[in-house]
Every structure is written in C-alpha cells, then in structure tokens.
Amino acid sequence: MKDDFAEEEEVQSFGYKRFGIQEGTQCTKCKNNWALKFSIILLYILCALLTITVAILGYKVVEKMDNVTGGMETSRQTYDDKLTAVESDLKKLGDQTGKKAISTNSELSTFRSDILDLRQQLREITEKTSKNKDTLEKLQASGDALVDRQSQLKETLENNSFLITTVNKTLQAYNGYVTNLQQDTSVLQGNLQNQMYSHNVVIMNLNNLNLTQVQQRNLITNLQRSVDDTSQAIQRIKNDFQNLQQVFLQAKKDTDWLKEKVQSLQTLAANNSALAKANNDTLEDMNSQLNSFTGQMENITTISQANEQNLKDLQDLHKDAENRTAIKFNQLEERFQLFETDIVNIISNISYTAHHLRTLTSNLNEVRTTCTDTLTKHTDDLTSLNNTLANIRLDSVSLRMQQDLMRSRLDTEVANLSVIMEEMKLVDSKHGQLIKNFTILQGPPGPRGPRGDRGSQGPPGPTGNKGQKGEKGEPGPPGPAGERGPIGPAGPPGERGGKGSKGSQGPKGSRGSPGKPGPQGSSGDPGPPGPPGKEGLPGPQGPPGFQGLQGTVGEPGVPGPRGLPGLPGVPGMPGPKGPPGPPGPSGAVVPLALQNEPTPAPEDNGCPPHWKNFTDKCYYFSVEKEIFEDAKLFCEDKSSHLVFINTREEQQWIKKQMVGRESHWIGLTDSERENEWKWLDGTSPDYKNWKAGQPDNWGHGHGPGEDCAGLIYAGQWNDFQCEDVNNFICEKDRETVLSSAL
C-alpha cells in the first residue's frame, strides 16, 4: 500500500511540474491570461480523463472481486469437503488405531504373559535337564558298573561251563570205570565160585583121607583139628566174600547216586582202581595159597607138619587180609563222606550263583525299563518343547510383521496428515492475504496519515482446554544394569514341597555270611520228560573213548622206526607156586611204587622227552590235573619247579603252547602274607599279566580265599583256591638237563 501511495504522489508531482505549475509567488507574477486559460482547459481535460480511468478501473476491480469471491466460495466448499473428509478419515483412523491399539495392547499383554510362561517353563526345563543330567550320569556310572559286572559274570559263566564240561568228561570216564568194576566183580564172583568148588573138593579129599588113615589116629586127630580150623577159616572167607558182594552192591548203588551229583571224581576213580588192584592181588595171593594148600594136602601123608605150618601161615595171612580190607573199607567210607560234603558244597555254590544271576538279571531288566521310560519321557518333552518353540517363533515372526505393517501405516498416515496440515496452513495464509487485499481495494487509498502512538498491551486471552491424553509410546530400550543392591533380609521359610521323584537305586550291599548247609532232602519223584531242546552248540572235544574190539589181523606192514620206551605195564597174574627152593640170603625188599623209572634220553634241543625248549629253559605242560601242592611236589620230583614268568616274550610263548581252555598252575602265591604275591623262591614278580579285576581273593563263601595263581585259557593270570584241580607247567634250566644227561 505504501508503494501505491508513493507512485501516485510521484505521478502527481511530475504532472504539476511538467505543466509549469509552481508556487504561488511565481504564478502571480509571470503568467499571462492565455496561459491561464490554456492551463484551465488542460485541467478539465485531465479531470475528465481521470474520471474515465477511475471508472474503468473500478469496473475492472469489481469484476475481479466478483471472480475472487466466486473462487473463494468454490475453494471454501472444496476445502470444507476436504476437511470433512479428512475429519471423517481421522475419526475412522482414530477408531481403527484405538481398536488396533487395544488389540495390540491385549495381544502384547498376552504375548508378554506367554513369554513369561515360556521363560518359567524353560527354567523348569533347565532344572529338569540339570536333574536329568545328574540322573543320566548316575545311570551311566551304574551302566558302566553293570557292564563290568556282566563281564565278570560272563567270565564266571565261562568258567562254570568249563567246569561243567570237565565234570561231564569225568562222569563219562567214571561210567567207564564203573563198567570195568562191574566186569571185575563178575570175574571175582566166578573166581569165588571156582574157589568154593575147590574148597568142596578139598573137604571131600579130607574126608577120604580120614577114612583111609585109620592107623595114624594121632596124626589124623591133629589133621582133623587143622581141617576144622581150615573149614572155619573157609567159612569165614565165604562170609567175608558175601559181605564183599554186598559192599560192592552198595557201592554200585552209591555210584548210581553219585552220578547225578558228583562234579569231579577222578581221585575216587583212581582210588577205586587201586582198591580193585589190591583186591585182585589179595585174591591172587589167596588163589596161590589155596593151590599150594591143595598140593600140600595131596602130600599130606608125608609132610603133615609142613601142612600144619602152612595152615598157620594161612590163618595169619587171612587175618592180615581181613585187617587190610577193614582198613580200606573204612578209608572208602571216609572218602565217600568227604565226597558227599564236597557235593553238598558244590550244589550250594551252584544254587547261590544261580540266585545271584537271577537277581542280577532282574536288576538289569529294571534298570533297562527305567532307562527306556526316562528316555521316552525326555524325548516326548523335547519334542513338545521343540514344537512350542517353533510355534513361538512363528507367532513372534507374525507379530513382528504386524508391527511393521502398523508402523508403515502410521508413518504414511502421519505423513499424509503433515502434508494436509501444511496445505491448510498455505490455504489459510492465502485466504488471509486475499481478505486483506479485499478490504484494502474496497475504497480508494487515502493520503498517508501521521504515525500514531503505540497502543497499550491487551489482556492475555483465556487458556485453552486441556487436550486429550496421547497414545502410549513404544517401550524404550532397556537401560544399563544397575549396581547390585545390598542383600535383603532372609525371607520366611517356604511351604514344604511335594514328594520328590524316586531316587536311583543304591549300590548293592556287601555279601552276607553264608548260611549253614541244610539237611539233605529226600529224593523227589522223577518229573515228566521235558520237550526236546534245540540243537546246542558243538561241545568241546571229548575224552578218548574206550578201546574197541580187536579187528582182523591185517598184513604185516613195513617196520617203522624204533619208538620211545613205553610206560611200565600193569603186573600180570602170579603163576602157580613152585616147589620151595633153598633158603636164600635175606635182602631188602623195594616196593614197586618206589622203583625208579628208566630215565629217557634227552632230545636234541637239550630237554628230556615231553619237555619243550624256549631260550635256556625247558618246560613241561602236564596232561594230568593236580592241586597246587601236588603239582609243586611233582615238579620237585622232576628236579624242577613251577614256572616263573619274568618276560613278555616268555608269556606269549607259553600262551601259544597252551592247548584247549584248561587252566595251568604257575609258581606264584600269597599264602605267606595276603596280597603280597611272590614266586616260590621268595622273589617278587617284575612282570605281571593279571586279568582285569584280578586278583580278587574271592572265597566263594567257604573257608579261605584264593591264594594260588594260575594261567587261564586267554593267557592271563588269575587267582585260584589252592585246593582247585588244574593242569600245571614245570620249568628247569637247560644246563642242569644237559649235565644230568651227561
């Protein structure tokens, strides 16, 4: 507006000066009349032009104002429509955002509660997993212990199976011995019948001699007395032989009874064979004496005095035989009692081991079931946890997507609102300018007035209403962890928890003391025959069978090389007694058992026959089985000792030389002091090859523990009871062998 007024002033001033209109002093002095007239005319013309231009300008201004007012009304209507639409959109957006905010708040609250529940569940799961780790470690330890026990049980079962096979072999051998004894008893019965017949013949001869020898009454009376004595002796012999038959029958019954229970009867078989040989010897002596008696009775007329002496000798021999048989039968009864006690102990051991194995199998089954149950529970829990975690991840992903969508929508809406607000501000500014221009153009601009004084400050306007509460913003990032506060006071004791889960089974207690052996029960009735079992595994190689029948004589073959000298044979039956020879000089009688065997020539390797050479030592691997002390004595009789294993090479060589699954004694024992194993020469072993878990000094619940060492079939060392029966290995230096051979 100021610029317009300045332009009008400049135009007016320019026009006045141009037409020569100056101050009044100059006009009054210099102007002429024509000039005044001409100037007045020009003034009228100018006034007319000015009125025309003002009318034209007013008309144009009115047209422009009409156009402006129409545009303003249309713009107002459009802006009012837009504002109503924006208000409706804002209301809709407010409602939607409120609903969405409520739904998101509810969803966030539920999500937070779910997350808290999941955290609680995860804590419980971690606690359970920690507990389960402890239980699993315990189960693993118990499983390792069970594996060790199973290995020990397998070894004991293998040893028991090996013992059972050896018992079966001994039973088979004992059956053969029993058949031989039965044959011997039948032969003895035949011999007794022959002797009875010969005794009857002798009695008849004596009666005939009594009838014929009437003249020699004194001699006959003495002979009759002697004959009566002999008849009484013969009757006693008959009674003794009948008792022997009964004893043999009882022994047969006892052997049948022992077949079902005995496990190791080799010593009994050897004793029975020795007893049978002794009985054969006594019977042979009796046969020889009876033959001599018959010869003497034929020559009784000439040598009656010799007959009386022979009868006295017979009585003495008979008494000695009776005493010997009584002593031997007492020894047999004592041995039978010992065998019965051994059988009872063996049966109790077998029952104890069977019960122990049953308990172990039941414990193993329980542990397996508990392990499988816990593993299935853990797998189910883990699968459910995996499923819940997968669901949580899916829900969190979907919630994040929804939050991203909501944020993008809010951003777009806020951007739209900001654009609309800026447009509204621009429209308001344009409207204000138009209104100002409209008020200014309504009248002609007047002259510029003087500058007025500054007005007083108006009173402050009323305070506006309080706005609505804004929406809750998003939670900010978590702040840094504060310092740890002081320890609070101890809380009150909590409630007593529920009953915990059942703990793992404790370790097995120590072995109890063995009970007293119960009385022997009566033999039960034989049960019905069971169904035929499955075909078993091939058993170990059995003992050599009995000698078969003699075959047909074949053609003589090519003579082979001369063999080694054989063992001395069984002494044959004594021949008939010859006539008495002249008395010879008295000499020392050497028994057969103490006679030295012929020493065989040593082999080329410097060791005797049946001995094997390794480095500078000779080794003897026995075929027979003995207890530890007997094996020691056997090796000492061979001028050797039980083997001392000092190197790994020697151990490997001995392992290769061992045949089958038999155990062998070695010269190692802790009989002097427990758990101090020493060789028989008193030295401690430098090299050791004990089996895992050995020596354990297991006493089997009877008597002392295991104090003697031996080699098992795997070549490892194990401790045994010194009363066990095993093979053995003897050892001696090759130099001593060579010197003795020279």
UniProtKB/Swiss-Prot annotation:
Glycosylation sites: 67, 159, 168, 271
Gene3D superfamilies: Mannose-Binding Protein A, subunit A (3.10.100.10)
Chain intervals with Pro residues compositional bias: 571-585
Keywords associated with the record: Calcium, Coiled coil, Collagen, Disulfide bond, Glycoprotein, Lectin, Membrane, Metal-binding, Receptor, Repeat, Signal-anchor, Transmembrane, Transmembrane helix
Membrane topology: Single-pass type II membrane protein
Alphabetical list of Pfam families matching this protein: Collagen, Lectin_C
UniProt region (Disordered), positions on chain: 439-608
Intrachain disulfide bonds: 607-618, 635-730, 708-722
Tissue: Expressed in perivascular macrophages. Expressed in plaques-surrounding reactive astrocytes and in perivascular astrocytes associated with cerebral amyloid angiopathy (CAA) in the temporal cortex of Alzheimer patient (at protein level). Strongly expressed in placenta. Moderately expressed in heart, skeletal muscle, small intestine and lung. Weakly expressed in brain, colon, thymus and kidney. Expressed in nurse-like cells. Expressed in reactive astrocytes and vascular/perivascular cells in the brain of Alzheimer patient.
Record-listed a carbohydrate binding positions: 691, 694, 696, 706, 718-719
InterPro entries: C-type_lectin-like (IPR001304), C-type_lectin-like/link_sf (IPR016186), C-type_lectin/snaclec_domain (IPR050111), C-type_lectin_CS (IPR018378), CD209-like_CTLD (IPR033989), Collagen (IPR008160), CTDL_fold (IPR016187)
Cytoplasmic side, ranges: 1-37
Location of this chain's protein in the cell: Membrane
Positions of Ca(2+) 2 binding: 670, 674, 697, 706-707
GO cellular component terms, A-Z: collagen trimer; collagen-containing extracellular matrix; endocytic vesicle membrane; extracellular space; membrane; plasma membrane
Residues annotated to bind Ca(2+) 3: 694, 696, 706, 718-719
Stretches that traverse the bilayer: 38-58
Gene Ontology annotations of biological process type: carbohydrate mediated signaling; cellular response to exogenous dsRNA; defense response; defense response to bacterium; innate immune response; phagocytosis, recognition; plasma membrane raft organization; toll-like receptor 3 signaling pathway
Biased composition (Low complexity): 502-525, 534-556
Domain C-type lectin: 614-731
Extracellular side: 59-742
Function text: Scavenger receptor that displays several functions associated with host defense. Promotes binding and phagocytosis of Gram-positive, Gram-negative bacteria and yeast. Mediates the recognition, internalization and degradation of oxidatively modified low density lipoprotein (oxLDL) by vascular endothelial cells. Binds to several carbohydrates including Gal-type ligands, D-galactose, L- and D-fucose, GalNAc, T and Tn antigens in a calcium-dependent manner and internalizes specifically GalNAc in nurse-like cells. Also binds to sialyl Lewis X or a trisaccharide and asialo-orosomucoid (ASOR).
The name this protein goes by in its record: Collectin-12
Organism in which the protein naturally occurs: Homo sapiens (Human)
Gene, per the UniProt record: COLEC12
